[in-house]
């Protein structure tokens, strides 16, 4: 993503008006690690590490402190509705994928403390039940996979004191995004 400073500024503005919960993901962990181990070199260019290096160069110590303070998971409570957990990878490990086809899923799911977990990390909208627990991935806004280039997210709503989930896929201005990336010379 081009202009991470703009994204962080927007998030901090939203946080002033609305209650927000931020969860640390693997990218934040990479930046935290890199600040502590700056002698490790990242490649530049169009690779994942190049994008990490580009973003890290834009971040301040205050930003990294903000990331470091984020939990990797959190139980969410809303009135009398069922408690659920949000996380990036899994509630246990920040970069552990909860893809339903992975062999270890049953063992991991058994350790969940809530009946519903909303995770990210693998960027594919999905919902499945294992061991009586519901695992949901809302997809992704910035790097959605299997979405025909559209942004994805999830809406949770109360339906008779139970959570109703609605997957949403919307178009966004891909050309503008590519233009922003080109201005930042991210294709060099």
Model segments located where?
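Metallo-beta-lactamase
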Residues: 47-83
